[in-house]
UniProtKB/Swiss-Prot annotation:
One of its GO terms (biological process) is protein autophosphorylation. This is Casein kinase 1-like protein 11. GO terms for cellular component: cytoplasm; nucleus. Residues 15-284 form the Protein kinase domain. InterPro entries: CK1_Ser-Thr_kinase (IPR050235), Kinase-like_dom_sf (IPR011009), Prot_kinase_dom (IPR000719), Protein_kinase_ATP_BS (IPR017441), Ser/Thr_kinase_AS (IPR008271). It is found in: Cytoplasm; Nucleus. It comes from Arabidopsis thaliana. The keyword ATP-binding applies. Casein kinases are operationally defined by their preferential utilization of acidic proteins such as caseins as substrates. Can phosphorylate casein, phosvitin, myosin light chains and poly(Glu,Tyr) in vitro. Keywords: ATP-binding, Cytoplasm, Kinase, Nucleotide-binding, Nucleus, Serine/threonine-protein kinase, Transferase. Partially inhibited by N-(2-aminoethyl)-5-chloroisoquinoline-8-sulfonamide (CKI-7). Autophosphorylated.
Length: 457
């Protein structure tokens, strides 16, 4: 099927393909239109004859995770001619895109608002028996419309089942495993060849948070002749960089986060509430308002930030309660890309400001374990990630990370809702999804057709 044939083709009887959003070894991603309702969707195509098919496997994981807060709706999956097709909700920009727009630095306030949701997303995946194994900024996207302030976790190409939900049996501890995921954000144990478990997703998330705060990580930009040599250099630098050095000049809660994650044993269930509480208490002590005004809003319209400035509050030296520790570059965006991306940011922000003046506050568990192990083996055998990213897909040339060892495809999930501590009147999750006022803070984001760039080293 050539390009013109694709554009004229109707998927599943009602989704017409629009412009191409991205492509790569995973297949192709298109904007789609529901010809019955006019709704815009994302359509992912994978050639039926591809060497390592994964779209059906991915769609099953997607269906299995349906019902979690922020999990996009899987609208259709099937085969049309020469392609397997998956139709899903359309999402907004990734955190890496927004990070670049904000000149590659996020404020502490934005990082803390994001951290709460990111932990929830990872917890939800874990609660359904799966590890993500490729936690990075590209794999978190903001929503659109009424879910504009909600973070979505995408890309289940490297997801792995770590326990049976019926028997609660955990996968066995193993060593001598190849690095799976993205080297920049991989946990120390992953570098050491140890089978990944829940603790590793959370350690990777910690590196993402420090990347946002610092602007970069100490092991970025290392030169090497081969991929293995580069992984070895990253591993060495990561292990030589103490948590205290990594988090120097930043609140001690980030140091506590890493110490806790690294104290977990292989099969330990993390105390996700404790980790959220670390950052929520810090948020309160800093005097921030939970208004969901992020840096990408303020960077275009500084006056919007006036309502979100921290109120002067006492800052007692608290030692947040928690469980005892059981010890055991992306290149600069090209002018053409930057222009299109900046235009999209400005367009959506302009609409939001005019619609509300100063921005206000705002922002299902299925039981089926029929993910085939054969499909898991297939996508664990893939080598190299070369996909370009549209609104939906995340790993692309020039993405925020070292190339994944295995190719990871683009799909979505998100976390469940959680009650806050007694000091917070409304949960971060419910605030992000429930306030019609500030839903416009990222509302109606123009589609970002991100082209290919150079692969980051």
């Amino acid at each position: 099927m050539d390009r013109n044939q694709k554009m004229d083709h109707v998927i599943g009887g009602k989704f017409k393909l629009g412009r191409k959003l991205g492509s790569g070894s995973f297949g192709e991603l298109y904007l789609g239109i529901n010809i019955q309702t006019g709704e815009e969707v994302a359509v992912k195509l994978e050639p039926v004859k591809t060497r390592h098919p994964q779209l059906q496997y991915e769609s099953k994981i997607y269906m299995f995770l349906q019902g979690g807060t922020g999990v996009p709706h899987l609208k259709w999956f099937g085969v049309e001619g020469e392609y397997s097709c998956m139709v899903i909700d359309l999402l907004g920009p990734s955190l890496e895109d927004l990070f670049n727009y904000c000149k590659r630095i996020f404020s502490l306030k934005s990082v803390l608002m994001l951290a709460d949701q990111l932990i929830c997303r990872v917890e939800y995946m874990h609660s359904r028996g799966f590890l993500h194994r490729d936690i990075k900024p590209d794999n978190f996207l903001m929503g659109l419309g009424r879910r504009a302030n909600q973070v979505y976790i995408i890309d289940y190409g490297l997801a792995k089942k770590y326990k049976d939900l019926q028997t609660q049996k955990h996968i066995p501890y193993r060593e001598n495993k190849n690095l799976t995921g993205t080297a920049r954000y991989a946990s120390v144990n992953t570098h050491l060849g140890i089978e990944q478990s829940r603790r590793d997703d959370l350690e990777s998330l910690g590196y993402v948070l420090m990347y946002f705060l610092r602007g970069s990580l100490p092991w970025q930009g290392l030169k090497a002749g081969t991929k293995k040599q580069k992984y070895d250099k990253i591993s060495e630098k990561k292990m030589l960089t103490s948590v205290e050095t990594l988090c120097k000049s930043y609140p001690s809660e980030f140091t506590s986060y890493f110490h806790y994650c690294r104290s977990l044993r292989f099969e330990d269930k993390p105390d996700y509430s404790y980790l959220r509480r670390l950052f929520r208490d810090l948020f309160i002590r800093e005097g921030y308002q939970l208004d969901y005004v992020f840096d990408w809003t303020i960077s275009k319209y500084p006056q919007i930030g006036s309502s979100s400035r921290p109120r002067p509050t006492p800052r007692p030296a608290l030692d947040p309660p928690g469980p005892p520790a059981e010890r055991a570059e992306k290149p600069t965006v090209g002018q053409d890309l930057r222009g299109r991306f900046t235009g999209a940011i400005e367009a959506f922000t302009r609409r939001n400001v005019s619609s509300q003046g100063a921005l206000g506050d705002r922002s299902r568990h299925r039981s089926s374990d029929d993910i085939p192990s054969s499909a898991k083996e297939v996508h664990e055998s893939r080598n190299g990630s070369t996909s370009k990213r549209g609104v939906i897909s995340s790993t692309r040339p020039g993405s925020s990370a070292e190339p994944s060892e295995n190719h990871s495809s683009r799909l979505f999930s998100s976390g469940s809702r959680h009650a806050t501590t007694q000091r917070v009147p409304q949960s971060y999750e419910s605030a992000a999804a429930a306030r019609p006022g500030h839903e416009d803070a990222i509302r109606n984001f123009e589609l970002l057709t991100i082209g290919s760039g150079k692969k980051r080293k």
